[in-house]
């Protein structure tokens, strides 16, 4: 009897949600805006949200909510956001000291090291807030505090077993703009956690050095140098779908206080600049029950007017009760220069433990006024250790790969003025096209007895503004390889209606590999500066795991979700946020996933999330 009531309740809930959804989708007005995830995609140079990393999304979502105040930020703050390279940050500081605060996008585009295209990509993440007269430098705004609290509950439905609901929580506190000091700490417990004791703790204390133009960080931090071939902790975008993804902008040493803290190093690090030379020493440690590790590292970089070069070295000491060893040690040299609009970069690294060398080199260059391309070659021998490496790659690790990549993007047609927009960024090209090709040879076979394996990937995407409100995006990709399933073809189309304050999207996605997979959803939403509400209703028919389809799901900041849909089912998701005061915002998400079309019964799940962020 309880099972019957559960099914009736589920149907009633879906009926109510669909009524709300259709009511929202029927009230489209005029105007236009881009969703936050698309702004992040454009900055990172990816063509789909499924290619993004959760840590990067969390970091950039916080900047969308509270943009970087470039007229108040120190050199350390400008660099650690990852928006600007070291040269751009130094150039901006120098411009502010000579000419005063930057007050417009056009003025920022004229600063040495910037440009209109780059400023357009970072525009949503920065603020020109200034309390000074033109030509003067902004003063400090005072201390700010940010507190984020979130809780979630998940339960299995439609199962004969009575499993208790799983519970997770997270808490984060950030102190900033407190003179030279900044600090942050985060606690988190996942669904698999036992009790209320946090599974992960991540925090830092940062002190800015004014005379040396640098900082000291104690606690959890990130160390990212060169193009990521030797030392780049944390995940990075491996996809090379657009030219913007080829060249990495290393942030050096930066503090970390993410909810997960999974990728951060823990220890003490410094980042100081003397003239054109930056020196970044660090030491990180990790302690477990029966072993411990120590990681000393250093980077020295020189920054010129047209580029930079640097040397990075680290060694990992592994210590047990029996012996001490050095399982991982690398040295690398890198450079990046920009000449006449062409970016050229390279990095080579030597793995002392295996005695193997790895290298990459590439360029991003204009072909015509409205077209640019990028090319890269990579040589990663099988013996090269992928530990702490996050360079561009064709698979998941920077090892056992000889590859070449090519990508291009072009703008077609005239300019289209967007409704409700004025000034910088108020118009877009009617059509844009991107393509990418990637060919890789793996010296050590992945499977079988062949001496080597080969993989080819091709991708193209078209974005067309049909009107001032309707946008059509079509993407086609093909992967061919000599192991596993030899072919994987995917075709995806998104039709979006963006009309302030409303938005609606229809997605159709088909995959052909082992069999055939299909996914589609209809989403409607409402967004203003004070509140936002989205509802998504989707269906998927995927009988084979190799045909699985990934789909980005909206969530609260710090909760990036890209589930793989497999089976035959439907899902409904409600996501909303409300700025109830100048100092606070609430986020909520409710999701329901069931499998009514499966021949063999499969339990679904229901999930509820709630998150508060307070600004003091």
Describe the predicted segments one by one.
Residues 16-25:
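Sec-dependent N-terminal signal peptides
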Residues 47-61, 106-141, 225, 372-374:
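Alpha-helical interaction/regulatory segments in DNA maintenance proteins
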Residues 194-251, 255-281, 370-386, 528, ...:
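Outer membrane beta-barrel
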Residues 2-12:
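Short, Lys/Arg-enriched N-terminal segments with co-localized hydrophobic residues
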Residues 162, 166, 296-298, 302, ...:
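Exposed, low-structure sequence patches enriched in small/polar residues
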Residues 135-163, 175-185, 216, 244, ...:
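Transmembrane beta-strand segments of Gram-negative outer membrane beta-barrel proteins
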Residues 54-103, 117, 122-126:
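Amphipathic, charged-and-aliphatic alpha-helical interface segments
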């Amino acid at each position: 009897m309880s099972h019957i009531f559960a099914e009736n309740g589920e149907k009633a809930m879906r009926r109510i949600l669909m009524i709300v959804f259709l009511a929202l989708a029927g009230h489209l007005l005029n105007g236009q805006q881009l969703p936050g995830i698309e702004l992040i995609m454009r900055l990172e140079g990816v063509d789909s949200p499924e290619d993004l990393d959760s840590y990067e999304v969390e970091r950039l979502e916080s900047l969308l909510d509270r943009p970087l105040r470039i007229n108040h930020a120190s050199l350390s703050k400008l660099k650690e956001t990852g928006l600007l390279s070291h040269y751009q940050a130094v150039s901006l500081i120098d411009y502010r000291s000579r000419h005063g605060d930057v007050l417009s996008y056009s003025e920022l585009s004229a600063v040495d090291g910037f440009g209109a295209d780059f400023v357009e990509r970072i525009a949503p993440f920065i603020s020109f807030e200034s309390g000074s007269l033109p030509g003067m430098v902004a003063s400090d705004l005072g201390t700010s505090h940010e507190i984020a609290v979130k809780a979630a509950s998940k339960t299995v439905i439609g199962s004969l077993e009575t499993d208790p609901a799983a519970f997770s929580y997270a808490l984060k506190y950030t102190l900033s703009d407190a003179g030279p000091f900044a600090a942050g700490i985060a606690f988190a417990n996942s669904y698999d956690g036992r009790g209320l004791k946090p599974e992960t703790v991540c925090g830092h204390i940062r002190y800015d050095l004014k005379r040396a133009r640098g900082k000291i960080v104690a606690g959890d931090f990130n160390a990212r140098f060169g193009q990521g071939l030797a030392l780049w902790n944390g995940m990075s975008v491996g996809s090379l779908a657009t030219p913007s993804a080829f060249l990495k902008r290393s942030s050096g040493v930066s503090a970390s206080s993410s909810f997960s803290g999974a990728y951060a190093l823990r220890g003490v690090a410094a980042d100081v600049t003397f003239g054109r030379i930056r020196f970044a020493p660090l030491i990180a440690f990790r302690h477990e029950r029966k072993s411990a590790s120590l990681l000393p590292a250093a980077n020295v970089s020189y920054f010129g007017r047209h580029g930079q070069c640097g040397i990075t070295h680290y060694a990992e000491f592994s210590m047990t009760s029996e012996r001490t060893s050095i399982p991982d040690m690398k040295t690398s040299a890198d450079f990046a220069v920009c000449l006449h609009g062409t970016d050229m970069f390279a990095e080579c690294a030597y793995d002392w433990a295996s005695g193997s060398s790895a290298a990459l080199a590439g360029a991003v260059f204009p072909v015509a006024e409205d077209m640019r391309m990028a090319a890269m070659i990579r040589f990663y021998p099988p013996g090269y250790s992928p530990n702490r490496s996050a360079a561009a790659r064709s698979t998941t690790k920077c090892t056992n790969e000889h590859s070449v990549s090519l990508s291009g993007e072009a703008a077609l047609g005239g300019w289209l003025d967007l409704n409700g927009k004025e000034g910088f960024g108020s118009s877009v090209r009617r059509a844009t096209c991107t393509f990418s090709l990637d060919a890789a040879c793996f010296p050590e076979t992945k499977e079988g007895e062949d001496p080597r394996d080969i993989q080819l990937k091709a991708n193209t995407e078209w974005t067309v503004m049909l009107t001032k409100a309707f946008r059509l995006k079509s993407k086609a990709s093909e992967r061919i390889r000599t192991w596993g399933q030899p072919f994987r073809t995917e075709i995806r189309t998104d039709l979006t209606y963006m009309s302030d304050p409303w938005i609606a999207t229809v997605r159709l996605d088909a995959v052909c590999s082992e069999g055939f997979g299909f996914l589609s959803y209809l989403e409607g939403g409402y967004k203003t500066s004070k509140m936002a509400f989205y509802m998504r209703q989707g269906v998927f028919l995927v009988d084979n795991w190799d045909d699985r389809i990934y789909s980005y799901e909206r969530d609260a900041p710090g909760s990036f979700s890209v589930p793989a849909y497999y089976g035959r089912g439907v899902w409904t998701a409600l996501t909303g946020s409300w700025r109830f005061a100048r100092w606070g915002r609430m986020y909520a998400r409710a999701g329901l996933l069931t499998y009514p079309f499966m021949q063999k019964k499969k339990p679904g799940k229901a999930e509820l999330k709630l998150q508060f962020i307070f600004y003091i």
